[in-house]
Design a protein with these regions (language model features):
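Cross-family detector of peptidyl-prolyl cis-trans isomerase
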Residues: 1-177
Length: 177
């Protein structure tokens, strides 16, 4: 609720980091707000194909009393316990393809997102942070790349797009395989 918005120029001047818990960069083109909790200890991703393992919590940002019936703050789906980040259930697995500034992803294997939303494509809001993170293969919850996102319907799941609602995410990104 009480976030400090910074613009992209400030974000780049801070070496693509947000400096406070409540500091979020607004990416105007997508409408996504991002707070970098941990950039990761790996290297920036270059052109190629990667297997990414993610843990996430998805929460509603608005109350809806229509077809979807949700309260702001409701957990919509998750595969991570937000108060216990070392809790390890099955990660969300997706194949990421990077080509220049283009990022695309497809969920594979065990997928909570597919089970919940019946979509195989990774939401664009999930892909945007990967341009600025350094994911690695790590078992340390302190070293894994981690962000908080405020995602508008247009960069979210197919259901968020259909019913026009924004979501909050906390997501980790780890290199798989």
């Amino acid at each position: 609720n009480d976030i400090k918005e910074i613009d992209e120029n400030t974000f780049f001047a801070q070496d693509t980091m947000t400096l406070a818990d409540n500091e979020y960069v607004l990416f105007k083109e997508s409408g996504v707000y991002m707070n970098v909790m941990q950039r990761g200890v790996g290297s920036p991703l270059t052109d190629g194909t990667y297997y990414i393992e993610s843990r996430f919590v998805e929460m509603a940002l608005q109350t809806r009393n229509d077809d979807i019936q949700m309260e702001a703050g409701d957990t919509l789906t998750a595969n991570m316990h937000i108060n216990n980040p070392s809790y390890w259930g099955y990660p969300e697995e997706f194949k990421l393809t990077v080509s220049g500034t283009s990022y695309s992803g497809t969920f594979s294997g065990v997928s909570q997102m597919y089970d919940t939303y019946e979509q195989t494509s990774v939401p664009t809001g999930w892909l945007l942070p990967l341009q600025y993170l350094k994911p690695s293969r790590t078992n340390s919850s302190e070293d894994v790349a981690r962000v908080r996102l405020l995602v508008p319907h247009s960069a979210g799941t197919v259901t968020a797009s259909r019913y026009v609602y924004p979501c909050y995410y906390e997501i980790t990104y780890n290199l798989g395989r």
